[in-house]
Amino acid sequence: GALVAAYGLYDGFLTL
């Protein structure tokens, strides 16, 4: 999710 992206976690999203 875009929310967890702020935490720098991976949620089926390309989040570093």
Curated annotation (Swiss-Prot):
Example GO BP: amino acid transport
One GO MF term: antiporter activity
Source domain of life: Bacteria
Main location: membrane
Location in the cell: Cell inner membrane
Catalytic activity field: L-ornithine(in) + L-arginine(out) = L-ornithine(out) + L-arginine(in)
Topology of this chain in the membrane: Multi-pass membrane protein
UniProt keyword terms in alphabetical order: Amino-acid transport, Antiport, Cell inner membrane, Cell membrane, Membrane, Transmembrane, Transport
Annotated function: Catalyzes electroneutral exchange between arginine and ornithine to allow high-efficiency energy conversion in the arginine deiminase pathway.
Family per similarity comment: Belongs to the amino acid-polyamine-organocation (APC) superfamily. Basic amino acid/polyamine antiporter (APA) (TC 2.A.3.2) family.
Name of this chain's protein: Arginine/ornithine antiporter
Naturally occurring in which organism (per UniProt): Pseudomonas putida
